[in-house]
Design a protein with these regions (language model features):
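Catalytic Walker B motif of ABC-type/P-loop ATPase nucleotide-binding domains
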Residues: 163-166, 463-466
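Conserved ABC ATPase signature
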Residues: 138-142, 438-442, 446
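ABC ATPase nucleotide-binding domains
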Residues: 236-305, 535-568
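H-loop/switch region of ABC-family ATPase nucleotide-binding domains
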Residues: 199-200, 498-499
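ABC ATPase NBD coupling module
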Residues: 71-85, 368-378, 384, 388-389
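Conserved ABC ATPase "signature" region
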Residues: 116-134, 396, 413-434
């Protein structure tokens, strides 16, 4: 008997022009681990929410979702609440109490369980998740990673049979994300809890999954094992844009197979360990070649020039007796440069952006920028940017406020020209069919794109971007990178806070690490990522010891090709 089964499920949001889900059918057994992937806006979140009655969106639907062969609509509320757990994308959206221990007990208290049972379950979960040191902390004092772990633990205290996770790592730093996914895998493996997980970052989940559901435009395009799906997409990368988001190991050796460097009869590796094993088996003379960095933009100016934006000796704390978040921090960004700022959850990256744009004042230190330079900021929560009832109205308003044309050659300053600019940006960010939608009806990735579009239309000289790639599929990340590169070539300055190491390694001019309230490292990407164990890329870990200095998939592929040529 299947644990969960979708039978020809279709769904459309109110006033939507097309279905968000179209005849979706699949089933999952007890203890299975299924990853749902697909391009941004393809219906992943909508699908997951159909399996959790309490948060199923309003709209018109067909077909039936079954839980243990009983229509989900007929499953008792108590059963659904206890047996089907759901972890959302934003950790803050799910926490409802002030203290960690109370959050763990909240669901159990609502089930009216005896005090002794609640205490036992809370103790058990705190021990399993390693929460002893922060068990009595306020939830407001937790890092993003701790908050998401608390959400997961609170759900597991209810003893669910099915755990649903909607991009649970999208707002977490690399270490916290890996820790969370390791815990989910442990729950699946040791406790037998079925996992239905949606992710754009497939690097750490593909190798753990039993099956992968690949979605496209609301339908299931493929339902297969990770290995088989990888092989299928490698043979036909045009079948889905998700090919660009496959684990780095698979993309590297898929390309090498096509180029004749790697035998085609071998399975594509999905993990770093397997990739290094294949690299060793190739027995190429890597000592005769040197990894060559991929070309970067030439827009970043010499460090001898006056910085476009500078923070000097910045100190900040949220209250007088509180902990210092920034401690004598110094940072400068040159004109036409893209600087990626990395660091753990709670390190102070978003706080720094707010200080640099004037939303918060440091209690010591100065922020310097040319008074004539316009500055715009993309916040971590893009909802804050939208004030109208449609995406089009928001974009058009931003275009009217802009002073120039970054995407249209000639602007007359009139309404028609502003509309043309708004349409072009919408097309570039694949929002044309969403222009009549209310911003809050968009998926997470679509809302992020709309926020980026609104920011670009402001025509600012300095852009502060807080997690701009959050919710974007790999293809849209490439599109965004192209836009950012065009802007830096025009002299636009950018400071980007990101947890996306691959994006930073591929497109940033410099990378900086914020730790303990200070910038502890500030280097060109290759110098920054090479030699690291955790703050580095998949390609860098695969190439370590073979192609020192290679940090992107393209650089590893190029290095292997050169070594293969030397061998021949």
């Amino acid at each position: 008997m299947a644990l969960l089964r979708f039978d020809k499920v279709s769904f459309a949001y109110p006033d939507a022009g097309k279905r968000a889900l179209d005849q979706v059918s699949f089933s999952m057994e007890e203890g299975e681990y299924i990853v749902v992937c697909g391009e941004s806006g393809c219906g992943k979140t909508t699908l997951l929410r159909q399996a959790k009655p309490e948060i199923t969106p309003a709209g018109a639907g067909d077909g039936t979702v079954y839980y243990r062969e009983q229509p989900l609509s007929e499953v008792p509320e108590l059963t659904s609440a206890m047996e089907i757990g759901y972890v959302q994308q934003n950790p803050d959206n799910q926490i409802v109490t002030d203290y960690v221990w109370h959050e763990l007990a909240f669901g159990l208290e609502n089930m009216a369980l005896p005090t002794s049972v609640i205490q036992r379950k809370v103790s058990e979960m705190a021990s399993f998740f390693g929460m002893e040191e922060w068990f009595r902390k306020k939830t407001s004092e937790l890092s993003g990673g701790q908050k998401q772990m608390l959400n997961l633990a609170s759900i597991m205290a209810m003893n669910p049979k099915l755990l649903i996770l909607d991009e649970p790592t999208s707002m977490l730093d690399p270490l916290a994300a890996r820790n969370l996914l390791d815990t989910v895998a442990r729950i699946n493996r040791e406790l037998g809890v079925a996992v239905l997980l949606c992710e754009h970052r497939l690097e750490d989940v593909f190798q753990r999954a039993d099956r992968v559901l690949l979605m496209k435009q609301g339908a299931v395009l493929a339902d297969d094992t990770p290995e088989n799906l990888t092989f299928t997409l490698q043979k036909d990368p045009t079948a889905s844009r998700i090919y660009l988001g496959l684990p780095g190991a698979a993309r590297i050796f898929g390309e090498l197979q096509q180029k004749g460097v790697c035998p085609t009869n071998k399975k594509l590796p999905l993990s770093i360990r397997d990739a290094r094993h294949v690299l060793k088996e190739l027995d190429l003379p890597f000592e005769k070649v040197k990894a060559e960095p991929e070309k970067r933009t030439e827009a970043a100016k010499s460090n001898k020039e006056k910085p476009a934006l500078e923070g000097k000796e910045l100190w900040f704390r949220y209250d007088e007796k509180g902990k210092d978040i920034l401690r004598g921090l110094n940072l400068s960004v040159q004109r036409g440069e893209l600087l990626a700022l990395l660091g753990g959850n709670g390190a102070g990256k978003s706080t720094l952006l707010r200080i640099l744009c004037g939303l918060k004042k440091p209690f010591r230190g100065k922020v310097k920028k040319d008074k004539e330079m316009r500055l715009a900021m993309l916040p971590q929560s893009p909802q804050a940017l939208f004030v109208y009832d449609s995406v089009w109205e928001d974009l058009l308003d931003a275009a009217k406020q802009g002073r120039g044309a970054r995407f249209v050659d000639k602007v007359q300053g009139n309404a028609e020209a502003a509309a043309e600019r708004a349409r072009e940006v919408a097309a570039k960010l694949e929002l044309t069919d969403k222009l009549t939608s209310h911003p809050f009806d968009l998926s997470g990735g679509e809302l992020q794109r709309a926020a980026i579009g609104k920011l670009l239309l402001q025509d600012a000289d300095i852009l502060l971007l807080d997690e701009p790639t959050k919710g974007l599929d790999a293809y849209l990340k490439q599109e965004l990178a192209g836009i950012l590169k065009k802007l830096t070539e025009e002299g636009i300055t950018m400071l980007m806070v990101t947890h996306d190491l691959e994006f930073a390694a591929s497109y940033a001019d410099r990378c900086a690490l914020l730790f303990d309230g200070r910038i502890t490292s500030e280097e060109e990407p290759h110098a920054f990522f090479t030699g690291n164990r955790f703050y580095t890329t998949t390609a860098g870990l695969i190439a370590e010891g073979y192609l020192p200095g290679a940090i992107t998939c393209g650089e590893v592929i190029a290095g292997c090709e050169k070594a293969y040529a030397k061998k021949m």
